Design a protein with these regions (language model features):
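Conserved small/polar residues in nucleotide/adenosyl-binding loops
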Residues: 122-128
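A generic structural signal for short, non-catalytic loop/turn and secondary-structure boundary residues
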Residues: 27-29, 48-52
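Accessory substrate-recognition/RNA-binding modules or partner subunits associated with SAM-dependent
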Residues: 53-117
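Short amphipathic beta-strand/extended segments with alternating polar/hydrophobic composition
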Residues: 44-50, 58
């Protein structure tokens, strides 16, 4: 039996926060494919007509996508180290994103907004000399 992969988030209930937005952002990779397996075992795929790396991400923590929005590339790598996602082939996942197109994380507007908030908050709450 051939495994079923979802290519769209329409009609899919109870998706992790920010998954839909991130999935839409990576819909047109330059090459290769990426399968994202959610904690509830649903599998979504994005693929290009061009050959390339075929990545597979197993999401273990549904807050992974929120972390991507907040922290961008750092959130992606640190969440891997924290065990929030796994893969049978890390090199293929990295190659997919390398070939996916320039600035894939640049579209994460929330990353810049959250960074601005964090810096502002830090400066506003610094202890002052009395």
């Amino acid at each position: 039996m051939k495994e079923q992969f979802l290519k769209d988030v329409k009609g899919q209930p109870y998706l992790p926060r920010w998954f839909s937005s991130i999935f839409k952002m990576i819909q047109s990779p330059n090459a290769g494919s990426l399968i994202i397996q959610l904690p509830d075992n649903r599998k979504f795929i994005v693929e290009s007509k061009k050959a390339g790396a075929n990545g597979y991400i197993v999401v273990k923590n549904e807050n992974f996508f929120s972390r991507l929005v907040r922290e961008g590339q750092n959130g992606f790598s640190e969440s891997y180290m924290d065990g929030w996602w796994d893969t049978p082939d890390l090199q293929a996942v990295l190659d997919f994103f390398l070939l996916a197109g320039d600035g894939i994380y640049d579209d994460l507007i929330g990353t810049n907004v959250v960074r601005l908030y964090a810096v502002s908050y830090t400066h506003l709450t610094l202890p002052t000399k009395a």
